[in-house]
From Swiss-Prot:
Family listed: Belongs to the DNA polymerase type-Y family.
Principal location: cytoplasm
Binding site for Mg(2+): 9, 105
InterPro entries attached to this UniProt entry: DNA/RNA_pol_sf, DNA_pol_Y-fam_lit_finger_sf, DNA_pol_Y-fam_little_finger, DNA_polymerase-Y, DNApol_IV, IMS_HHH_1, Rev_trsase/Diguanyl_cyclase, UmuC
UniProt-recorded name of the protein: DNA polymerase IV
Pfam families listed in its UniProt record: IMS, IMS_C, IMS_HHH_1
Lineage per the UniProt record: Bacteria, Bacillati, Bacillota, Clostridia, Eubacteriales
Gene that produces this protein: dinB
Length: 400
């Protein structure tokens, strides 16, 4: 059967979410960005009114204000955007059960066979677009094709509020004349290397010698050559927590730090989040890894093997040991991260029971007791919010 794949891409998602609760910004240049006093002072998303002034994602605020002095800046609210994303995915699930979320603001839908229910693909895309707008007040663009790559490319051709079909038979006319930089999967470095090989358009890439591309670019060369020819056999795969290979948290710091005590407090908070996520998915891992990036943008990663766990204390303990061994006070730290991986398979399908969590028994294992305490903490946080409970070291630090 001929496959029909949609890529639904939410237009200017973060700032569009903000416009649903700040209608006063509609029609005015506006963007979501961090505090200009620290490193988060970059544009995360700008609306189309701001883009007319040349405002782009990742642009620093002081440059943006020169281009568009009257731009309205709204600080990011990622919890709000995650909720809106969840609502969008809920609407999409009414049209097909086969959905692959590609990011917070886009997803592939396998619509193969759905014509009998919803009609032709273009009309179905119109229904989805109107449904999202009427229910959530958000706009999207939709790409339609026979595979994921071409659907993704099609979704980028008309923004905002565009519906574009791009079938393989049409790529010579619609896709090949475009510059290689437009192609999904090609970043600045790859584009530069392609131009050094005199490859400027997607068509030139499609017709270039595949073996030479592989020689110069490795696996990437083979992949982008295939994509340029409209070939992508990958299925639309709904994600499951069982697919998770690693759970990690990192933070780019507002200011560089040089003292290890501050780093320990940050690592505790990150470990807390990793442990909470691991317990949510009932994932016990036996590999802890830390990532340290310095102000000069050099970075190191270290990992160690531990007894499988999802407990914060054990994740943090392994992280601290590696942090202390590798701390260099002469190199200011810009980013810290910690992750848990190497998950065992046998306990993935077990349910964490609230009754088991809270039952009073005679167990003497300190690990088991900590397990129960942390699971109880998770349930409290779920009800009252993440910040309701903090470790003593975090509270002490915040008071200083």
């Amino acid at each position: 059967m001929h496959r029909v794949i949609f890529l639904v891409d939410m237009n200017a998602f973060f700032i569009s979410c903000e416009s649903t609760r700040h209608p006063e910004i509609i029609g005015k240049p506006a963007a979501v960005a961090g505090d200009p006093k620290n490193r988060s002072g970059i544009i995360l998303t700008a609306n189309y009114e701001a883009r007319k002034f040349g405002v782009k994602t990742t642009m620093v605020l002081h440059k943006v204000l020169k281009l568009c002095p009257n731009i309205i800046i709204i600080p990011p609210d990622h919890c709000f955007y995650k909720q809106k994303s969840k609502e969008v995915m809920g609407i999409l699930s009414k049209y097909t059960p086969v959905i692959e979320k590609n990011s917070i603001d886009e997803a592939w839908l396998d619509m193969t066979g759905c014509e009998r229910i919803f009609g032709r693909s273009y009309q179905t895309a119109e229904c989805i677009m109107k449904h999202i707008n009427s229910e959530l007040g958000l706009d999207c663009s939709i790409g339609i094709s026979e595979n994921k790559f071409l659907a993704k490319m099609a979704s980028q051709m008309k923004k905002p509020l565009g519906i574009t079909k791009l079938w393989k038979k049409d790529i010579e006319l619609k896709l090949w004349p475009l510059p290689v930089e437009f192609m999904n999967g090609i970043g600045k470095q790859t584009a530069r290397k392609l131009r050094e090989m005199k490859i400027k358009t997607i068509g030139e890439l499609a017709n270039f010698d595949r073996r030479y591309l592989i020689k110069k670019l490795g696996k990437v060369g083979a992949e982008i050559h295939q994509f340029a020819n409209g070939i992508d056999v990958s299925p639309v795969t709904p994600h499951s927590h069982k697919d998770v290979k690693s759970i990690g948290k990192s933070i780019t710091l507002a200011h560089d730090i040089s003292d290890i005590e501050s780093a320990k407090v940050i690592l505790m908070e990150l470990s807390d989040k990793v442990g909470m996520t691991a317990r949510k998915y009932n994932k016990k891992g036996h590999t802890v890894q830390i990532n340290i990036k310095y102000s000069n943008f050099q970075s190191i990663t270290r990992q160690r093997t531990i007894t499988e766990t999802y407990l914060v204390k054990e994740i943090y303990s392994a992280g601290i040991e590696m942090l202390e061994k590798n701390w260099n006070e002469r190199l200011p730290v810009r980013l810290l991260g910690i992750s848990l991986s190497g998950f065992s398979k046998y306990n993935e399908d077990e349910q964490i029971s609230m009754f088991n969590m809270l039952e009073i028994d005679n167990e003497k294992s300190s690990v088991r007791k900590i397990d129960k305490i942390e699971a109880a903490i998770d349930s409290i946080r779920k009800k009252y919010g993440d910040s309701i409970i903090k470790s003593g070291s975090l509270i002490k630090k915040s008071k200083n």
